[in-house]
């Protein structure tokens, strides 16, 4: 029989109506001549009542049912008695008296309970992912994701964007992470790469006169995984011609506002706040600031430059900085042992220690209090905004070490003391980025975003011969949500001359630039318009909207932290015949100790 509606959508408006429902048995309660079944589908759960009073045949069927059996029923919707109403259920006002029932399929006992809050391991749930996805909290993630994509399509279509697919088999180019490579059977020894982003193709579309492009782009990066990363992911990718950075940001804000309204019925305030990269680093110690709470970093370098406390004065003398955060009521809530643990933890950022002071009615208290006179105390209090009962935490070192240290402590302590409004969605633009970033691991300068980013107009000369390109700032912008990068973009370079200068500044020879990006450089000779764009991480956006810790929870079939997939056991070895077709020999090397 044809299904009337979803089980989870049956409500009081259906009272007295005959409905046909199909779904899974969530729970069975047998009272002899009365059996209650909770029937579950993707929209929720409804209670079924089986009784010989309604149908003896249906009662016999109910006696056979077990959890996760697939069931079809037809019955009459009835109001529950007042004492039986379940306010915790969306359908708790009604129940369905079953007149006909049919088992569509039986089921083995699942390896874990199909319910929220189940204690099964992540690995087990991923092995039986199709069962895990039956749980309401997992379905919620996929539904939110779907609403986001529907809002994206609707809004960008209204704004005149064309949905255009770009290739998934393309050329390997250095964009930061390792490429996933695909061997070519037709061209032995040659490889395609799965795209890390559609960056160059969407720029070429602007050169083709498309004007406004978007797609929900699948991207692939062979990198170490963490909570907000997967080897394959989806981004909301867009590119426009003839627009300024501010105009692109306005379109993006409209897109985000539509998504928030259509998914969570939240009206976000427009326009979003904007701060420069430098201001973000100065105030928050990070380029991804969480602005839902205060406790900002305060620079006291000038106050302590001549201090008798040599850790502070020495740091300033060596070109470093001294900054502090004031932890509200921290003097009462953090013990010496707690502070020592924090000091030990921040050593990973290069910090050599953590100085601290408690603010009492009598002034500063703590190991370094003796180094500060009354006037210095007053200046530090004024600069940090500290009050009696607060705890001051200090870091003195190079600017990056200080920012990393106090930036981490700021967020960690805000979480510990419940200073963050978890119901707030705080969007922020971080703009005016450096064009280059120094990679301390590789000991070289790299593009802060990517090699195709346009410098600020007044900084273009820094790419000329004899100038210092690392002084340049970029026409780039990141959109931050609750302390995480939601997406980012820039105005792109649109002339060959400037693009070649940029690549040269990154260490590309003319030959290597043409080898890697020759098709783009050639295209730039043919009248490219001013253009720019942005990409937003769809998986991360969905994760933040459903308030989950890992993007796996909003991806139907994700990889685990080892980049494998327990259900299909991918990746796997392939046959010698397949390798021979690809002209490949495999030499599996043991990992280095």
Swiss-Prot record:
Binding residues annotated for L-aspartate, in chain numbering: 175, 221, 449, 492
Top-level EC class as recorded in UniProt: ligase
Example of a GO MF term: aspartate-tRNA ligase activity
Subcellular location: Cytoplasm
InterPro entries: Aa-tRNA-synt_II (IPR004364), aa-tRNA-synth_II (IPR006195), aa-tRNA-synth_II/BPL/LPL (IPR045864), Asp-tRNA-ligase_1 (IPR004524), Asp-tRNA-ligase_1_N (IPR047089), Asp/Asn-tRNA-synth_IIb (IPR002312), AspRS_core (IPR047090), GAD-like_sf (IPR004115)
HAMAP family: Asp_tRNA_synth_type1
Pfam families in the record: GAD, tRNA-synt_2, tRNA_anti-codon
Residues noted as binding ATP in the record, renumbered to the chain: 221-223, 230, 485, 537-540
PANTHER family: ASPARTATE--TRNA LIGASE, MITOCHONDRIAL (PTHR22594:SF5), ASPARTYL/LYSYL-TRNA SYNTHETASE (PTHR22594)
Keyword Ribosomal protein: no
Family from the record: Belongs to the class-II aminoacyl-tRNA synthetase family. Type 1 subfamily.
One GO CC term, this protein: cytoplasm
Record keyword Nuclease present: no
Enzyme Commission number(s) from the entry: 6.1.1.12
Organism: Pediococcus pentosaceus (strain ATCC 25745 / CCUG 21536 / LMG 10740 / 183-1w)
Protein name: Aspartate--tRNA ligase
GO biological process, one term: aspartyl-tRNA aminoacylation
Job description of the protein: Catalyzes the attachment of L-aspartate to tRNA(Asp) in a two-step reaction: L-aspartate is first activated by ATP to form Asp-AMP and then transferred to the acceptor end of tRNA(Asp).
Residues covered by region (Aspartate): 199-202
Gene: aspS
Subunit and partners: Homodimer.
Entry keywords, A to Z: Aminoacyl-tRNA synthetase, ATP-binding, Cytoplasm, Ligase, Nucleotide-binding, Protein biosynthesis
Catalytic activity: tRNA(Asp) + L-aspartate + ATP = L-aspartyl-tRNA(Asp) + AMP + diphosphate
């Amino acid at each position: 029989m044809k299904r009337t509606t979803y089980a989870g959508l049956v409500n009081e408006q259906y009272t007295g109506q005959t409905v046909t429902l199909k779904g899974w048995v969530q729970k069975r309660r047998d009272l002899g001549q009365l059996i209650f079944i909770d029937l579950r589908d993707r929209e929720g759960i409804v209670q079924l009542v089986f009784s010989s009073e309604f149908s003896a045949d249906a009662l016999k069927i109910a006696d056979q049912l077990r959890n996760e059996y697939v069931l079809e029923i037809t019955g009459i919707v009835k109001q529950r008695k007042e004492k039986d109403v379940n306010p915790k259920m969306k359908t708790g006002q009604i129940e369905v008296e079953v007149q006909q029932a049919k088992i569509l399929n039986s089921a083995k006992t699942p390896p874990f309970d199909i319910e929220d809050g189940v204690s099964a391991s992540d690995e087990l749930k991923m092995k039986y992912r199709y069962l895990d996805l039956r749980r309401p909290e997992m379905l919620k993630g996929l539904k939110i994701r779907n609403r986001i994509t529907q809002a994206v399509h609707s809004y960008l279509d209204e704004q005149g964007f064309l949905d255009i697919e770009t290739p998934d088999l393309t050329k390997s180019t250095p964009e930061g992470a390792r490429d996933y490579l695909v061997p070519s059977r037709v061209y032995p020894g040659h490889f395609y790469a799965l795209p890390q982003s559609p960056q160059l193709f969407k720029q070429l579309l602007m050169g083709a006169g498309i004007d406004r492009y978007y797609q929900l782009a699948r991207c692939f990066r062979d990198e170490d995984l963490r909570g907000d990363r997967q080897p394959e992911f989806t981004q909301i990718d867009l590119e426009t011609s003839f627009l300024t950075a501010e105009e692109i940001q306005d379109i993006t804000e409209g897109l985000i506002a539509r998504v928030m309204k259509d998914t969570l019925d939240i009206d976000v305030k427009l326009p979003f706040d904007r701060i420069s990269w430098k201001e973000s680093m100065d105030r928050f110690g990070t380029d991804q600031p969480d602005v839902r709470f205060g406790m900002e970093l305060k620079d006291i370098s000038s106050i302590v430059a001549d201090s008798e406390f040599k850790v502070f004065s020495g740091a300033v003398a060596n070109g470093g900085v001294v900054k502090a955060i004031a932890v509200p009521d921290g003097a009462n809530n953090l013990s010496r042992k707690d502070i020592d643990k924090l000091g030990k933890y921040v050593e990973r950022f290069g910090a050599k220690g953590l100085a601290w002071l408690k603010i009492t009615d009598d002034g500063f208290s703590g190991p370094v209090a003796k180094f500060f006179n009354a006037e210095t105390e007053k200046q530090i209090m004024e600069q940090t905004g500290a009050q009696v009962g607060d705890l001051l935490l200090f870091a003195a070192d190079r600017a990056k070490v200080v920012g990393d240290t106090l930036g981490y402590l700021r967020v960690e302590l805000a979480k510990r003391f419940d200073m963050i409004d978890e119901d707030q969605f705080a969007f922020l633009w971080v703009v005016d980025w450096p064009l280059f970033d120094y990679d301390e691991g590789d000991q070289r300068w790299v593009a802060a975003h990517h090699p195709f980013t346009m410098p600020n107009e007044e900084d273009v000369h820094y790419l000329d011969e004899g100038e210092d390109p690392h002084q340049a700032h970029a026409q780039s912008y990141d959109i931050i949500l609750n302390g995480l990068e939601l997406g980012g973009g820039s105005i792109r370079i649109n002339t060959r001359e400037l693009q070649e200068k940029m690549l040269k500044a990154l260490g590309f020879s003319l030959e290597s630039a043409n080898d890697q990006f020759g098709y783009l450089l050639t295209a730039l000779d043919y009248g490219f318009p001013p253009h720019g764009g942005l990409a937003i991480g769809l998986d991360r956006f969905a994760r933040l909207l459903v308030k989950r810790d890992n993007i796996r929870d909003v991806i139907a079939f994700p990889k685990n932290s080892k980049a494998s997939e327990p259900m299909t056991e991918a990746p796997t070895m392939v046959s010698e015949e397949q390798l021979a077709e690809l002209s490949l020999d495999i030499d599996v090397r043991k990992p280095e100790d």
